[in-house]
Amino acid sequence: IANSIRDEIPGTIKFIFQPAEEVALGALDMMADGVLDGVDGMFGMHVWSELPAGQVSLEAGGRMAATDQFEITITGKSGHAALPHKCVDATPCMAATIMDLQTVVSRQVNPVSPLVLTVGKVTSGTRWNVISGSAKIEGTVRSLDSESRDMAEESVKRIAANTAASYRCTAEVKYDRL
């Protein structure tokens, strides 16, 4: 559309594709390479599979949610399944942490401030007859406002630490705002 009316627009039109937009790194490389030098204005768009083909959705302000990525590493003490009293099983702690994280959206966020917390990957254990000494939870938080985003980050860290402590484990949280 813009190309068809280029003679009516003063200045130069640049069409760009931002690589690595999901992790918010592509724009930095593009700026470092000078792609945006001399640009006076910009209109950005994002492909959204939920929007029917041929339709465009325009709104003032932010349109897509901010994306954060978290990784929780839970540490207990591994050992043989025949000797559970000598171990600190990280797997039940992982399960409890996942359940406790569900309260972030249902009980801690203002219901008119959309926020999604997703646990997308869990790993624990190395063998069928060994109590797991470590577990990992990986997920994402999507938010539309900074207050909810801040609250979610604080909650993920607090829940991970407190739940781990209640299971005699420790939790290390890596939380990246992408």
What are the language-model segments listed below?
Residues 92-178:
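Metal-dependent amide/peptide-bond hydrolase catalytic core
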